C-alpha cells in the first residue's frame, strides 16, 4: 500500500506540472493580450480559494460519510474538468511562422532551452525566480518547528497561520493587475522582490504568531503579483509554437531550487543547533534569507525595469 501511495503521489505530481504548464500555454489562445494579467490573477484567486478554503472542509465532510468516498469524488471532478476543457471552442495548435519539419522530443526541449537562454530578459527572470524560491523554501523547511517552538502556537493558532497564504493569494489575484497597471511592471516586481528579505527580517525576529500571519498574507500577495506579471509577460512575448517548451524550461529553473532550499534550511538548523540555542537556530534561516535576499535585490532590481519589460513586448510584437 505504501509503494502504491508513493507511485500515485508521484504521478499526480507529474500530472499537476503538465496541467499548470498547459494552462499557462493555453491562456493566450483564449484571452486577448491586454487582458492576460487580469485573467491570470483571477485564475490564481480561484485556485487559492478552492485549494485552501473549499477543498479541505468539503473533504472532511465527505470523509465523514465514507473514508473511501473522497477518492471517487476526486476522480469524478477530473471528468468534469475534461468536459469543461472540451467545451472551450477554438483552435489551439501552435502557429509556426514558416513551415518546418517535425523535431523529436530532445530537439524540441533543446530548442526551448536555447530560446530562453538567448533572451536578455527571460533568462535573468528565470534565474532570479529560482533564487527567490530557493530562499523561500530554505526558511519554509522548518516553519512548523518555528511556529511550535518559537511562536508557541496552539493547534488552532497554527491552523490559522495556514490560512495566511491562501488569503494573500486570493487578494493578490484580484489586486495584482490593478497594482501593476498603477505602479508599473518594474516597481511591482521590485516590491515582490523586496518583500522576501523584509519579511524574513520581520518574521525571523517576531514573537507573536499574528504578526507572522499578517506578514505571510502580504508575502503571498506579492508572490502572486510577481507571478501575474511574469507569466503574462511570457505569454505575450514567447512565440506560440515555443510557449509550452520555453515555459517548461523556465519552470525547471524556477522550481529546481526548491528541494535545494529545503535541504539547506534543514541543514542550517541542524548544524546551528549544536552551537546556538534552539530558538536562535530556528531563527537563523530567516536571517540568512534576509541577507541573501537583500543581495539578490541589489543585483536583480536593475534588470527588472518597466522599460525593459515594455521593450521585450515591443520586440516580440514586431
Language-model segments: residues:
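Hydrophobic alpha-helical transmembrane segments
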Residues: 2-9, 13, 38-96, 156, ...
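Flexible cytoplasmic inter-helical loops of multi-pass small-molecule transporters
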Residues: 86-114, 309-317
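Extended non-transmembrane interhelical loops and adjacent amphipathic helices
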Residues: 21-36, 43, 243
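Hydrophobic alpha-helical transmembrane segments of integral membrane proteins
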Residues: 24-25, 51-53, 255-256
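C-terminal transmembrane bundle of multi-pass solute transporters/carriers
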Residues: 2, 66, 110, 117, ...
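Residues that mark transmembrane-helix kinks and helix-interface sites
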Residues: 17-25, 29-30, 56, 141, ...
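Juxtamembrane interface at the ends
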Residues: 84-100, 224-233, 237-238
Amino acid at each position: 500500500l505504501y509503494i502504491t501511495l508513493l507511485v500515485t503521489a508521484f504521478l499526480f505530481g507529474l500530472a499537476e506540472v503538465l496541467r499548470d504548464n498547459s494552462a499557462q500555454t493555453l491562456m493566450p489562445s483564449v484571452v486577448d493580450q491586454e487582458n492576460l494579467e487580469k485573467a491570470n490573477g483571477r485564475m490564481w484567486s480561484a485556485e487559492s480559494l478552492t485549494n485552501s478554503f473549499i477543498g479541505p472542509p468539503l473533504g472532511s465532510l465527505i470523509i465523514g460519510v465514507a473514508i473511501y468516498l473522497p477518492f471517487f469524488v476526486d476522480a469524478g471532478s477530473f471528468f468534469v474538468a475534461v468536459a469543461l476543457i472540451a467545451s472551450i471552442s477554438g483552435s489551439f495548435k501552435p502557429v509556426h511562422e514558416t513551415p518546418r519539419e517535425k523535431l523529436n522530443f530532445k530537439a524540441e526541449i533543446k530548442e526551448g532551452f536555447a530560446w530562453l537562454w538567448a533572451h536578455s530578459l527571460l533568462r535573468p527572470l528565470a534565474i532570479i525566480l529560482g533564487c527567490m524560491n530557493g530562499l523561500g523554501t530554505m526558511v519554509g523547511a522548518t516553519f512548523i518547528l518555528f511556529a511550535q517552538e518559537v511562536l508557541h502556537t496552539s493547534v488552532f493558532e497554527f491552523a490559522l497561520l495556514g490560512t495566511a497564504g491562501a488569503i494573500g493569494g486570493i487578494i493578490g489575484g484580484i489586486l495584482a493587475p490593478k497594482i501593476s497597471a498603477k505602479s508599473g511592471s518594474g516597481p511591482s516586481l521590485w516590491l515582490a522582490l523586496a518583500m522576501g528579505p523584509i519579511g524574513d527580517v520581520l518574521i525571523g525576529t517576531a514573537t507573536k504568531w499574528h504578526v507572522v500571519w499578517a506578514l505571510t498574507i502580504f508575502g503571498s500577495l506579492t508572490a502572486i503579483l510577481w507571478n501575474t506579471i511574469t507569466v503574462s509577460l511570457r505569454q505575450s512575448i514567447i512565440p506560440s509554437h515555443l510557449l509550452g517548451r520555453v515555459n517548461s524550461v523556465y519552470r525547471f529553473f524556477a522550481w529546481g531550487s526548491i528541494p535545494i532550499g529545503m535541504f539547506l534550511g534543514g541543514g542550517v538548523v541542524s548544524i546551528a543547533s549544536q552551537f546556538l540555542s534552539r530558538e536562535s537556530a530556528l531563527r537563523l534561516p530567516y536571517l540568512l534569507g534576509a541577507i541573501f535576499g537583500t543581495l539578490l535585490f541589489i543585483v536583480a532590481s536593475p534588470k527588472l525595469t518597466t522599460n525593459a519589460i515594455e521593450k521585450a513586448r515591443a520586440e516580440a510584437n514586431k
